[in-house]
UniProtKB/Swiss-Prot annotation:
Low complexity composition-biased segments: 49-72, 133-155, 204-213
One of the record's GO cellular component terms: nucleus
Taxonomic classification: Eukaryota, Metazoa, Ecdysozoa, Arthropoda, Hexapoda
Protein name per its UniProtKB record: Bifunctional lysine-specific demethylase and histidyl-hydroxylase NO66
Enzyme class: oxidoreductase
Family stated for the protein in its record: Belongs to the ROX family. NO66 subfamily.
Biased composition annotated in UniProt, kind: Basic residues: 14-31
Organism: Drosophila grimshawi (Hawaiian fruit fly)
Listed InterPro entries: JmjC_dom, NO66-like, RIOX1/NO66-like_C_WH
Amino acid sequence: MDEMSAYVAYGMKKTAKKPAKKTTKQNRQKQKAANIYSLATSTPAKISAVKQNNGAKGKAKANGVKGNAKAQTTKDSATNSVAKMADESVDDYSSDSSYDEDEDNEELSHSSNEDDYGSELSSGEEFEEYTLNSPSGSCSCSASSGSSNTENSPPAATSSRTPKKRSTGDMDDNNNKSPAVKQQKLQPQEQKEGKELSKKGSRKSAPAAAPSCPLLRLSGNAAAIKSSAMPSKATAEKRKSCPLPKKMAAAGKGVAVVKQEPKAKVESVQNGGVEDSVERGICVLGALLDPLSLDDFFSRYWESKACQVKRKRKDLYSDLVSFEMIDEMLIENHLEFTTNIDVTSYKDGVRQTHNPDGRAMPPTVWGHYSDGCSVRILNPSTYLKGLRGVCAALQEHFHCLVGANVYLTPPNSQGFAPHYDDIEAFVLQVEGRKRWRLYDAPSPNDVLARTSSGNLKQQQLSKPIFDEVLEAGDLLYFPRGCVHQAVTEQQHHSLHITLSVYQQQSYANLMEALMPAVLQNAIKHNLDMRRGLPLGTWHHLGMVHGDKKTKERSDLITHTQSLFSKYLAPTASQIDAAVDQLAIRFQHEALPPRIASSEKKRTVFGSRNKKDKHGNCRCDYDLTEQTKIRLLRQNIVRLVAQEENSLRLYYYVDNALEYCKYEANFMEIDRVEANAIKMLINSYPKYVSISSLPLPNVEHCLDTATGLWERGLLITEEPFKKN
C-alpha cells in the first residue's frame, strides 16, 4: 500500500469510530468554554458585558456569597459572556464530536499529581515504555493489509517587497531568532549541520536520518525497523527518557502558584464607543492570566520569577489549537520540515532532530509521533486564525513581536534538552498533562539572558525551583534566562502553546542603536574627539603595561574617560531616534492586524468595486470633509526622520503571515503631511474629521486621508452608505 493509500485508510478508520455519548457534565463544560481568542476581535459592547458580569461576580464575593450553587451560577454567567464574544466571521477549526472521550476517561486523564507520580516516578531513574492507545493521546498507523489501526493609494510606497525565505540559520536549536537576525535584518544564511559543542557542554546535533514514510517502520518489516533513527515499538527494547530525579513534594522558592479564585476583571477602556487596540491587548492578557491581576503580575513576577496559574477549565484554550486542527492543517496546507515543523527527541541525554526533507505529510509526522518524537510547529499563527488573533492583540500591548510555537508530545517522552531562552515565555497547556521543571539561571550573567543557551546536560543543573504538572487550562510563566525542561507522563500526551514576547527588547538593545549615532555626532562637532593620540601612547597603555603605575598612563586613562563623560552623553533627540530604530524593527516583524467583521465594513478591506453600464469602475466609498477617521491600530504606523531631511511612514498592515517575508513597508511623505500624521497618532483612539487635519486646504486633507485609507491604515467611524 502506498503512502497516500495508507493515510486514506487510516482516515477512514478514524472517522468510523463510534461517537462517544455526551453526558450532562460534558454539556455543562461545553457551555463554560472561554474562547480567549475571541477577545482579540470583540466589540466594545461585548467587552462591556464581560465587565458587568465580572463586576457582579466580584460584588457577590464581597457580600460573602460562598455557597457552591450561587458561586457556580455567577461563574457560568461570566464565562458564557466571554464565549459570546467570538466573531461570527472567524473561521473556526472546531473539533468533531467523534473525538470526545467519555466521562470516565476524562476524569482518569486529570487525576491528581501526587497519585500519578507516586506510582510512575518512584524509581527516579527512568520512564517505562508507554502504551499507544487513544486515551493517552498516541497515534498508531499501519501500512500493511490486515493489520489493525488504533484510533488515536495616493501616497506611493517606495519599498520593494522582495521575498525572503526563512532558513534554519535564523534560529538556534530552541527556535529562537539570533540577535544578528533580529537587529540587522540581513539575508539569512543556511545553517551548517553538526555544530560543535558549546563551552557549557551543550550539543547542537545535526538532523538524524529518517525514512520518508515512517509508516514502513510500523509494518513489522525488519529491514525498515533496523534503519529507523528511533527505536520502533516492534523492538523488544524499552524506550527510556533521560533520567530525572523524583518529583518534589511542592513548588520551590521563587515560584508562585495561583489557584482558581477569580479576582481580576477583564477591562477594556472605551472612549466614545471606540476600543483602543492597546487596551484590547491588555484585555486578552488579563483573560490569559485570570484570576491573577495584571498589577500583581507585572509588579511581582514580570522579568523576576516564574508563576503558575491553575484552573479547572480544561477547554479554555481548545479554540486555539487541537490535535485535530493540526491534522487538518497538515492536509490543507503545504508545510515543510525544518521551515514549518520539527520532529525532535531527547533520550539518554542526547537531543536529536529527525526532520526528513520536503513536505510534512500527515503519515510522516504521525509516524514520528508514534515513535516517541515531539512535534514542534514553528509558525502556527500563519494557519490558525484564533491563535493569530491572540498574538496580534498582544503585540499592540507589548510593542513587539509576539511569537507562538505549538508543541505536541506523545506519552512518556521528552523532545528537548534543558535550556534557557531569550524570551518571556507564557506556556498555555491545551490538552493532556506535562511535568515542568524550572531551575535558576546558571550564573548571574544569564539572568534576563539576551541570547538562548545551548542544550544543557543534567549534571549542569542546580536543584529545581519548580516541579509541577500542568493540566489542560493551566498557564505557566517564566522569564528569560530561566532553565526549563518538560516531560510527559506515562499515560498522557501533551499539547501546549508557548507565547514568546520581549525578545531583544532591553536597554542594551536601545544602547546598541543609540551609541553609534552619539559617537559619530560627537566626532563631527567636537575638535577634542578628532585630536591625535599623544606620542608614546603604545608605551603606556595595553595589556603588557596593565600593571604599571606611571603618571603618563594615569593621565591618558583620565583624559580618555573625560571625553566619554563630556561628549558621549546622549541628547533627547538622539534617544528618540534610537527608539525609532527599534520601532522600525517592530513594524517589520509584526503580524498584520486581525480585522473583525464590524471593522471590515469601515475599512478598505470591506470595500467592493463595481462597473457601470459603460464598463467604468465605480467605488463604493466616498470620503468627504465631514467623514471621521482614525488609525486602524494604535501602533500600526511609525513616522521616522531619515537623512537629508526626508520622512518615512513605516506600517505593518501589509506584512505577510510568515516572519519578515518581505522588506519593511514604508512610504515617503512631505513634512507638511507629517503634521496630519502626528495628529492622527496623538488623537488615537478618538475619531477626527478630515477637515480638521492641519493641512493647507480641504483638497489636501481629502487627498491625504484618501491615500491613507486606501492603504488600509485608517478606519471610519461609520460605514459608507451604499448607493
